[in-house]
């Protein structure tokens, strides 16, 4: 089981089996890469490695659900869904995964749930685990966008600075595509910039 008192009835092996059954081969490979990077970052920064592994394995567990099914999950669990349906559709899967963790899979640790929820957007006052999962998703081994190698090097030296640059890239990408920007991403960048100037 995941470390004592972390609010989970699910082991890392169980999480791995669960997501393998729910995801395409390509998405599953990405998930395993995120897990490896998350554990590496957790070791580097002294975070709980098992929590990092579990959050990473579950972060995209709802990614391939139809939008209608995610909306139904939110409607059925309005209190814990945190108005997710009002957010841009590309971020729904993090909230849907968090709801499923709580209602079906026995994962209730607030740190793990938070990291799953905000892995696409970031948010204000991100915890160390939030930052690790966000960065692990951005820099997992199969990613090959311009600047990813620089982020991989930077995140091992200064996580806050890497987060700042990753959020800037993410915002630029969303704007370039003409998609709506989640307000949590702007708040996360403001926080990250403040942390880098302290």
Could you tell me what each predicted segment is?
Residues 30:
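N-terminal glycine-rich anion-binding loops that anchor highly charged ligand groups
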Residues 14-21, 39, 44-165:
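Divalent metal-dependent catalytic cores for phosphoryl transfer on phosphate-bearing substrates
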Residues 159, 163-177:
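Long, amphipathic alpha-helical surface segments
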Residues 24, 43, 121, 172-179:
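Generic secondary-structure signature for well-ordered alpha-helical cores
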Residues 1-9:
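Short, Lys/Arg-enriched N-terminal segments with co-localized hydrophobic residues
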Residues 172-198:
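Charged phosphate-binding loop/patch that engages nucleotide di/tri-phosphates or the phosphate backbone
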């Amino acid at each position: 089981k995941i470390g004592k008192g972390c609010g989970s009835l699910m082991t890392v092996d169980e999480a791995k089996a669960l997501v393998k059954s729910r995801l395409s081969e390509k998405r599953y490979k990405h998930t395993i890469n995120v897990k490896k990077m998350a554990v590496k970052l957790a070791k580097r920064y002294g975070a709980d490695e098992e929590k990092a592994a579990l959050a990473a394995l579950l972060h995209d567990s709802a990614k391939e659900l139809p939008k209608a099914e995610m909306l139904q999950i939110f409607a059925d669990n309005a209190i814990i869904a945190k108005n997710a349906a009002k957010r841009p559709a590309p971020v729904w899967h993090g909230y849907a995964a968090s709801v499923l963790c709580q209602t079906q899979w026995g994962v209730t640790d607030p740190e793990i749930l938070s990291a799953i929820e905000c892995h696409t957007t970031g948010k204000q006052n991100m915890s160390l685990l939030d930052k690790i999962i966000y960065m692990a998703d951005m820099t997992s081994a199969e990613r090959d966008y311009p600047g990813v190698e620089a982020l991989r090097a930077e995140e091992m030296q200064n996580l806050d600075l890497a987060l700042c640059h990753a959020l800037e890239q993410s915002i630029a990408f969303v704007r370039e595509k003409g998609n709506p920007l989640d307000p949590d991403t702007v708040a996360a960048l403001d926080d990250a910039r403040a942390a880098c100037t302290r």
